[in-house]
């Protein structure tokens, strides 16, 4: 099973993906490469060249497969697509290849948690995070992929994730 978390910044993607990777047996956790890349280089805002490198590496991680293992992705192609659309507006073929990444489900995290500041985040306003959340919903619907919106408390989100996986509701 390949599960990806998506949504605006500071919406719980990392918290939930790390948690889920400990809940399921035989799991490979794949972190968000952009954060690793930018923090390692002490970059606050990615340039076009940085973004291209991030896309290339993250997409190679999307193609990572190991038989019988669950793959839990802290981010997905939609995070890269929205970021590109909002900031760079580049034509990158990697951002158009949806079926080949083969995610079984995308969990769209609502921005209903308190925004946590860090050096890489740029949208503290709830209205901006809400606008981006709507953009993610449109992207997911237009791409006709399986997705479930996660909203509510952390426990409610965890419960919905587990019941969705157990019921195979995707």
Question: Residue spans of the language-model regions?
Answer:
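The conserved Walker
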Residues: 9
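A glycine- and Lys/Arg-enriched "phosphate-lid" helix/loop adjacent to the NTP-binding pocket
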Residues: 88-156, 160, 169
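Conserved lysine of the Walker
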Residues: 13
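Hydrophobic anchor at the beta1->P-loop junction of P-loop NTPases
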Residues: 5
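Conserved nucleotide-sensing/catalytic segment adjacent to the nucleotide-binding pocket
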Residues: 43-89
